[in-house]
Structures are given as C-alpha cells and as structure tokens.
C-alpha cells in the first residue's frame, strides 16, 4: 500500500500562505530592557516609571485625564487606510483604592484625550470602562480595535481566553491622532504601581 504522503506535502505547500495570512504587526514593544522607538512622554516624572523584569511599570499619581502624568504616547496608525487593533496587558501590582483610579489605553486627537479603554476602580469595585463590565481580576489584556470611524473595546480577564467586547461605537476621525498607555487618579502619598506588558499594534481585516 502506498504511504499517505500527499496530504503532508499539501500542508507544506499551504504553510507559507497561512503564515502570510497572519495579521501584520505594525509596532510591538515588549518593554524588555528599554522603551521601543518613537514613544514620547507627556508630563514625565522620571522617578515614577521604570522598566522592571521585562515590563513597564508606572506609579499611579493623582490627576485627571487633562493633567495625567507619565502618559506614554506614540503616533496612531492611519486608520483611513486600514483597520487596527491596539493591545496591551495591564496589571494592578497593588489593589486600587482611590475612586476612579485607573489604567489603560487612551486615544488622542490634537493633544486632547477623546476616548479611553481602562480598568477602573469605582465605588470599591473594578470595572472595564466603557461598558462598566465587572472586572475583579488584577490583570487584564486590553484590545482597542479602530476603523476609519468606529471603535470596538475588548478585554481578556487574566489575559487569557476569549476577548470580551465591552462597548463599540463611533470614533470620528481627527487630526494628529495618538495612542497612549497611562494611569491616573492614584492616591496621594501611597505608591501604587501599574505594570504594562506586551504592547502591540497590528493591522486587522
């Protein structure tokens, strides 16, 4: 009997095509030893951020969206030409205690925050905002998907399993778009550090 080798060769022939179909990564930063290229700090406090054990840690300082400290920004991909997913894993290394203490992804237009996908402490409990979906886990992976005029906000509890959609809606195009990872509304006089891991921007179909 002839050995069944044909399917094996078919799979070999298909492998390059399968690899080519993977969504292309536009930018990736593991925060391994240093920050990747083209990041810029907004209101940097050098004493309140660090690269530690293969991740970026930022101390959650008091403040609001309009005066956040140590926000890390970079130019957003051109969503008029394609759709993109922005992902990062965040971990509260200490339980948040302050009302509206939060960390996550913020979208900027012309230097102003216009949208956020965050893990936020509200009335003693932790939620995903927008959507206010309960999220008691200390670690979540965030995914903000953007098209030319819309967004879809998702997260993975414990950075595992399927992504859950918490909200979707319109995100009108604007000038000078940037994407940021940041945290704010921290307690005064107490160090709460948030860890950011595996930041990635990739093109999606």
Where are these regions (language model features)?
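Extracellular glycan-recognition regions
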Residues: 21-205
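Bacterial N-terminal signal peptides
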Residues: 6-15
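Positively charged n-region of N-terminal signal peptides that target proteins for export
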Residues: 1-5
């Amino acid at each position: 009997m002839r050995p069944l080798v044909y399917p094996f060769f078919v799979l070999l022939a298909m492998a390059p095509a399968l690899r080519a179909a993977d969504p292309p990564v536009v930018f990736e930063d593991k925060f391994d030893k240093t920050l990747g290229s083209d990041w810029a700090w907004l209101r940097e406090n050098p004493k309140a951020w660090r690269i530690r054990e293969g991740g970026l840690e930022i101390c959650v300082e008091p403040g609001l969206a309009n005066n956040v400290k140590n926000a890390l920004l970079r130019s957003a991909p051109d969503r008029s030409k394609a759709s993109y997913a922005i992902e990062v894993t965040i971990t509260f290394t200490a339980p948040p205690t302050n009302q509206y203490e939060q960390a996550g992804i913020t979208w900027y237009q012309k230097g102003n925050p216009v949208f956020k996908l965050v893990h936020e402490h509200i009335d003693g409990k932790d939620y995903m905002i927008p959507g206010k979906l309960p999220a008691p886990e200390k670690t979540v992976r965030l995914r903000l998907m953007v098209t030319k005029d819309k967004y879809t906000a998702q997260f993975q509890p414990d950075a595992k399993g399927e992504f859950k959609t918490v909200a979707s809606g319109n995100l009108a195009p604007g000038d000078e778009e940037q994407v940021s990872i940041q945290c704010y509304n921290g307690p005064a006089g107490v160090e709460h550090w948030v860890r950011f891991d595996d930041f990635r921007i990739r093109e999606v179909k």
